[in-house]
Amino acid sequence: MANNKNIFLIFSGLFVLAGFSFFLSLSTGSNGMSFVECLQVLLGNANENSELIIKSIRLPRVLAAIFIGAGLSASGCVFQAVLRNPLAEPLTLGVSGGAVFGAAAAVVLAVSTFFIPLFSFAGAFLAVGAVYALSRKKSFDSNAMILSGVAVSYVFSSTVMLIYSMSSAHQIQAAFSWLMGDLSTVDTGLLIISAVIICAGIAVLSMFGNIINVISLGEQKAQTLGINAQKYVKLIFITASLVAAVSVALCGVIGFVGLMIPHIMRKILGGNNIILIPASALGGAIFLPLCNAVSRTLFAPVILPAKIITGIASGIFFMFLLSRAK
C-alpha cells in the first residue's frame, strides 16, 4: 500500500503522463506536428490550416480516447472490486455485446450513422438489464453476474451474426468502422454529452470508494459493519454500467482497457478504491490516446483500429504477469 507522499507523487506522475499522451496523440497523423505547434493551435496562435487539422479532426479524436479510456478503466476497476473477480470488465459483463447488438440493429433499420451510438447505448443497457435480471435470483452473487454476462454476450454475438448474414455489404460497411473501435468517427455533439456523463459517473463511483472497499471484503463482512451490501451493489453496478455503456456507445467496442489498467494501478497503489478508481480513470486516459498514436504510426499510412493495439498490449501484459508468477 502506497503512503500519502507516494500517492501524491504517483498522481503527479500520472498527470504528467496524461499531458504527454495528449500532445503525442494530438501531434500524430498524416501531417506530423510538434508539441509546440499543437500548443500554438490550442492557444490560437497558429495558421488556419493547422487549426483546421487539430481542432476539427484530431482534437475530437484524442478527447474521445481520453474519456473512453477513463470510463472503461474506472468501470472495470469497480466491477472487479464489487464482484471480487479479476476478470470482470465491460466486455465480460455483456455491456460490449449489447452495444454491438444495438449497432447491428441500427444498420438493419438503415438509420443515419449519427444514431448508431444511440442504438448502441440502448443495446448496452438492454444487456445490463438482462444480466441484472438473471443474477437477481442469486442475490447478485459475483459468479452469477459474471456467468450471466458471458451468457448474454454469447446470445447477442450470435444474434449479431444472424443480422449480418441477412444484411447487404453496404449495410455492414455502414457500421464496420464503429464496430472496429475507430476513434475518428466520433460526433462532437455526442462527445460532449458522453464526456459529461462519464466524468459525473466516475465522480460518483469515487465517492462510493469507501463502501466499495467494504463490499469487496464480502457481503457478510459488509453486513457486520452495518452496510446493506445488496442495496449498494445494485446502485454501484448500475452507475458503473452507465459509464461503460456510454464509453462503448461513443466509438465502438475497445476491449481489455477496463481489464488491464485497473490491474496495473492496483499493483502500484494497492486496493483502496478511494484512490484506485480515479487512478484507473487517469491510467485509461493515458493508455488509450497512446494506443491511438501507435495505431496511426505503426503501419502508416495504413491506420489500424485502436482495439487491435489495446488487445495486443493487454495480451503481452498478462503473459508477462503469468511468466513472473511464482
Question: Residue spans of the language-model regions?
Answer:
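Alpha-helical transmembrane segments in inner-membrane proteins
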Residues: 1-326
